[in-house]
Design a protein with these regions (language model features):
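Long, charged, low-complexity intrinsically disordered regions
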Residues: 1-83
Length: 83
């Protein structure tokens, strides 16, 4: 079963990008319209890599940094394309 959240904050960029791609495909196939990507706050390296990947991914309609009660800069909220 696919969760509505992917936690990448303990991953390296090299580990995170393939996992993110697979997760977005799985979430789309599971029918999710919105998912959360947890990348942590840290130095922002992982967040920047996730942002680059989301900009080019064909299943991503839009994305934004999490709000005050969503994890703020440690989380990205992703809206997926419609099926």
């Amino acid at each position: 079963m696919v969760s509505s959240e992917l936690d990448l904050h303990s991953f390296t960029v090299e580990e995170a990008l393939p996992a993110l791609d697979q997760y977005l495909n799985d979430a789309f196939m599971a029918g999710y319209s919105e998912v959360r990507i947890v990348h942590g706050k840290g130095a922002g390296t992982l967040r920047q890599a996730v942002t680059r990947e989301l900009k080019r991914h064909p299943l991503v309609r839009s994305f934004r940094i999490g709000g005050h009660r969503e994890g703020q800069t440690g989380v990205t909220i992703v809206k997926l394309t419609e099926r």
